[in-house]
């Protein structure tokens, strides 16, 4: 008899605690279905936003190398979804219908304007999704537009947007904060009563690859000589 790995998190049930975070592998139905078929208990759908969709660049990944070309970390410059809101919502509804026992959270990022949140929240809720994730952590591309980490770094904004979401949506609200802040506890304490929603501490952390000896990035990602 197999062990029971089922969980309940923020009122969301899942057959196991192994979920995929919002990222390129969760950006469309094809990828999410493959994850479910492989046994993943839940996914956070790649961040949705307002139309028109963001325009991503390629390549979106780079590696940080150590001695002997060992990969020590992966950096990405991916923005939010580059597909239309309509297509994403349609696929989310179909996937949830086909896989009702799996957790499906929808990551969201729209401007700090209440009407923008008031518009998108009912559309997401109508898909049958289990909850929403507020992306207050993206450190590249979106903060320049007043979203992502630009929100997570201001506790008053975190409180304001979370309150809007709890007002205009009945789904569980998960707040994903940015680590690119002096004291993350200030933002974590910001969500309004009746108690803070679950919060994920880390999105992406800003970094750059530099040589230990000398200055500037190593050519071609090469490590320092011995």
Question: Language-model features: where?
Answer:
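Short polybasic linear motifs
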Residues: 214
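N-terminal capping/small domains of soluble enzymes
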Residues: 1-105, 109-114, 118
């Amino acid at each position: 008899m197999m062990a029971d790995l089922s969980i309940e998190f923020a009122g969301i049930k899942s057959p196991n605690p192994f979920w995929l975070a919002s990222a390129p592998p969760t950006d469309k139905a094809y990828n999410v279905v493959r994850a479910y078929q492989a046994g993943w208990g839940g996914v956070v759908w790649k961040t949705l936003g307002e139309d028109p969709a963001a325009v991503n660049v390629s390549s979106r990944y780079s590696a940080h190398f150590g001695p002997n070309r060992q990969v020590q970390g992966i950096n990405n410059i991916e923005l939010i979804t580059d597909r239309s809101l309509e297509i994403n919502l349609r696929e989310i509804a179909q996937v949830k219908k086909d896989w009702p026992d799996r957790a499906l959270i929808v990551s969201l990022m729209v401007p700090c304007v209440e009407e923008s949140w008031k518009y998108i929240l009912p559309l997401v809720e109508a898909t049958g999704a289990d909850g929403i994730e507020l992306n207050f952590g993206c450190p590249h591309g979106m903060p320049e537009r007043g979203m992502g980490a630009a929100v997570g770094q201001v506790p008053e904004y975190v409180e304001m947007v979370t309150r809007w979401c709890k007002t205009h949506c009945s789904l569980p609200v998960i707040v994903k904060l940015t680590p690119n802040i002096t004291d993350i506890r200030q933002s974590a304490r910001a969500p309004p009563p009746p108690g803070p929603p679950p919060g994920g501490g880390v999105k992406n952390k800003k970094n750059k690859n530099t040589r230990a000896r000398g200055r500037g990035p190593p050519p071609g990602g090469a490590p320092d000589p011995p």
